[in-house]
Curated annotation (Swiss-Prot):
Residues 294-355 form the SH3 domain. Residues 107-210 form the PH domain. One of its GO terms (biological process) is adaptive immune response. Positively regulates T-cell receptor signaling by enhancing the MAP kinase pathway. Required for optimal conjugation between T-cells and antigen-presenting cells by promoting the clustering of integrin ITGAL on the surface of T-cells. May be involved in high affinity immunoglobulin epsilon receptor signaling in mast cells. Pfam families: PH, SH3_9. Its main location: cytoplasm. Homodimer. Interacts with FYN. Interacts with PTPRC. Interacts with GRB2 when phosphorylated on Tyr-271. Interacts with FYB1, which is required for SKAP2 protein stability. Part of a complex consisting of SKAP1, FYB1 and CLNK. Interacts with RASGRP1. Interacts with FYB2. This is Src kinase-associated phosphoprotein 1. The lineage of its organism: Eukaryota, Metazoa, Chordata, Craniata, Vertebrata. The modification Phosphotyrosine is found at Y142, Y219, Y232, Y271, Y295. The SH3 domain interacts with FYB1.
């Protein structure tokens, strides 16, 4: 979404309001209720700026930069909570709910200890600091340790490139270095515990970047070759929490009644191969002509999923979910519909329900 142009007087007013909350009330003796109200409003500023790409104070940098890593003096030091650095200099797009503890993150792609190169280290400080790093939902977090309640810094991975970088060091660890670079943002340099671990970080981030640049999850080359030789495994082959007798009969989209599960050989595909003629018009038992079903938009639940938030859709293993939108694909979520209920669903919990023949 492109931000609408704001009149200058409105931008100034918003800047003044945010600065007053951040700087003007910094040293005031506020009650707990007043502090909560202030922090709530400041969070609202950050979410609106991120959602609509508005940057009232165009200062570079990432979220909550580590004071030991990045010379931060002079920037806002207020907190969203009593001890969290205020994020007013953050300008990466589309980011919300970024102040999370290391153990609170979900959909983690890669995590572990790395040495991060500081941008401006002091004379007595080390150039490389050990950080607990996590890649989750298109974000790169780095913490003081794996139990930290808030990150030292966070940045959006989209728009970066990643590669091995042995030129960063001249000691025995040079083959364990990698970096993330961007044309219009600062670079990040890291050292892993071993060359193999560094390559794994590079591979995982590269795979994520491919996913962020498309609406489908890319496959590794060896996986593509295997798929040409094999049929899809039966869904019962997936490890999941207890299903047993709880697996329910499947209601096919566009069909009348319930299709009871049958006991057939395990090698049989779970996918229904549909002829092209069924795509345009179908005929039900009453002989009425009706519009065909878009089978490509249907996905099947791999495991039970219970939504924790009101906008999350709950479903069980085997449920057929119609995907309405993939606009939140970069965060690992799609918008789906089940039994006339609409909500977001984690794409990792879904698999294609039908294999449609191409023309």
């Amino acid at each position: 979404m492109q931000a609408a142009a704001l009149p200058e007087e409105i931008r100034w007013l918003l800047e003044d309001a945010e600065e007053f909350l951040a700087e003007g009330l910094r040293n005031e003796n506020l009650s707990a209720v007043a502090r909560d109200h202030r922090d709530h409003i400041l969070r609202g500023f950050q979410q609106i700026k991120a959602r609509y790409y508005w940057d009232f104070q165009p200062q570079g940098g990432d979220i909550g930069q580590d004071s030991s890593d990045d010379n931060h003096s002079g920037t806002l030091g207020l907190s969203l909570t009593s001890d969290a650095p205020f994020l007013s200099d953050y300008q990466d797009e589309g980011m919300e709910d970024i102040v999370k503890g290391a153990q609170e993150l979900d959909n983690v792609i890669k995590q572990g200890y790395l040495e991060k190169k500081s941008k401006d280290h002091s004379f007595f400080g080390s150039e490389w600091q050990k950080r607990w790093c996590v890649v989750s939902r298109g974000l790169f977090y780095y913490y003081a340790n794996e139990k930290s309640k808030q990150p030292k810094g966070t940045f959006l991975i989209k728009g970066y490139g990643v590669r091995m970088a042995p030129h960063l060091r001249r000691d025995s660890k040079k083959e364990s270095c990698f970096e993330l670079t961007s044309q219009d943002r600062r670079s990040y340099e890291f050292t892993a515990t071993s060359p193999a671990e560094a390559r794994d970080w590079v591979d995982q981030i590269s795979f994520l970047l491919k996913d962020l640049s498309s609406l489908t999850i890319p496959y590794e080359e060896d996986e593509e070759e295997e798929e040409k030789e094999e049929t899809y495994d039966d869904i019962d082959g997936f490890d999941s929490p207890s299903c047993g007798s709880q697996c329910r009969p499947t209601i096919l989209p566009g069909s009348v009644g319930i299709k009871e599960p049958t006991e057939e050989k395990e090698e049989e595909d779970i996918y229904e191969v549909l002829p092209d003629e069924e795509h345009d018009l179908e005929e039900d038992e009453s002989g009425t002509r009706r519009k065909g079903v878009d089978y490509a938009s249907y996905y099947q639940g791999l495991w039970d999923c219970h939504g924790d938030q009101p906008d999350e859709l709950s479903f069980q293993r085997g449920d057929l979910i119609r995907i309405l939108s993939k606009e939140y694909n970069m965060y690992g979520w799609w918008v789906g519909e089940l039994n006339s209920l609409v909500g977001i669903v984690p794409k990792e919990y879904l698999t294609t329900a039908f294999e449609v023949e191409e023309r």
